[in-house]
């Protein structure tokens, strides 16, 4: 983030073009059918070869993601069993993550609200922030 001196507004500044982290690419694919990694590669080839890039058909569903550190090394997510779950984080110890997808925005919001409460009470781990930043 940077502060615009003339207005005092805080704005986000991206320093490079890339596919986002934190499994957001998987969430985008769940909602749109677009694999950002694949399309990035196709776009790079198109630019390098001077050919036209065409975006594939986009699905207009809704998706959401929840990710948290956990108290458990390998948390059991079996009690999250809704059919809207399209992805589960399984490769990172001490983490829980789920992506849900539906054509209903209300359903996604309802699931995320429910999951946030359940993750907070049954899984979430955090450490207090230090009094001052470490160098």
Where are the language model's segments positioned?
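Short hydrophobic alpha-helical module
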Residues: 15-22, 34, 43-50
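Peripheral (often C-terminal) accessory segments that flank ATP-dependent C-N-forming ligase machineries
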Residues: 38-135
